[in-house]
Regions:
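Conserved HGGG/HGGXW glycine-rich cap/lid loop of the alpha/beta-hydrolase fold
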Residues: 4-57, 62, 77
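Flexible "cap/lid" loop of the alpha/beta hydrolase fold
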Residues: 113-154
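Conserved hydrolase catalytic core segment
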Residues: 83-129
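Active-site loop/oxyanion-hole signature of alpha/beta-hydrolase fold enzymes
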Residues: 46-90, 94
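Alpha/beta-hydrolase
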Residues: 143-218
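Short aromatic-enriched loop/helix-cap "lid" or pocket-rim segments at secondary-structure transitions
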Residues: 30-31, 56-59, 124-129, 179
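Alpha-helical elements of Rossmann-like donor-binding domains used by nucleotide-donor carbohydrate transfer enzymes
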Residues: 32, 68-75, 101, 166
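Structured segments of extracytoplasmic/periplasmic soluble domains
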Residues: 36, 76-79, 105, 170-173
């Protein structure tokens, strides 16, 4: 399989590899970094993990497990020539999970690790989503969402109609969806739903069911 990377800038001592969220989302949402990191002399590298963005998209679900992604990341590091003198990882959301696991196994190769918008425990995240975020929603809207989830009706257009203004605009990108940046919309349009559901689960209210990541805990 082939995975896609793109290098922006050149700094022999500071090279930041971007671990995108999702799982299955791709690099597009982070294109905003181009407006300020190069000015600071920071080299950074986009990396679409296998199954996401511009990388190959195999359909075998056996590939969507955390240890395999960790070893894939190590192969990418070697291919890019990154080492303990210059290699920084930036992990956002699911990328934070991947970054933590990589650091635990291959920490000797890292100069630094940055985690953004991710907790160190999937069960704690699930509790937060249900006990804090869900309770901030309109009870009638939440009841509709939960009813659709109970039926497994995640592909119902009304499900996304409810989530977009009541969840995504409040907790994912806090401006009206009509004003979302083009790269963010481009990334959402390309998300690998099969990979996302296999690892995260179909609901935004925590990881449940058969989600591969639901028991992950490094707290």
């Amino acid at each position: 399989f082939n995975v896609w990377t793109k290098r922006i800038g050149n700094n022999p001592t500071v090279k930041v590899l971007i671990l995108h969220g999702g799982p299955g989302a791709g690099h597009e949402a982070y294109e905003v970094f181009e407006s300020f990191l190069p000015k600071e002399g920071i080299e950074f590298i986009y990396y679409d993990q296998l199954g996401a963005g511009n990388s190959d998209r195999p359909t075998d679900k056996i590939l969507w497990v955390l240890p395999r992604f960790v070893d894939e990341l190590e192969q990418v590091r070697v291919a890019l020539g990154l080492n303990k003198d210059n290699f920084y990882l930036y992990g956002h959301s699911w990328g934070g999970i991947l970054g933590i696991e990589y650091a635990l196994k291959y920490g000797q190769n890292l100069r630094g690790l940055l985690i953004s918008d991710m907790m160190s425990s999937a069960p704690a995240y699930s509790r937060y989503a249900n006990e804090v975020l869900a309770k901030q929603m309109d009870p009638k809207v939440l009841a509709e969402i939960k009813a659709l989830e109970a039926k497994g009706d995640f592909t119902n257009p009304h499900y996304m109609e409810l989530l977009l203004p009541n969840y995504y605009e409040k907790y994912i990108c806090r401006i009206p969806a009509s004003q979302w940046p083009e790269p963010l919309n481009r990334g959402f349009a390309k998300i690998n739903q099969e990979q996302y559901v296999t690892m995260q689960g179909p609901s935004e209210f925590g990881m449940a069911g058969n989600a591969n990541l639901k028991n992950w805990d490094r707290s």
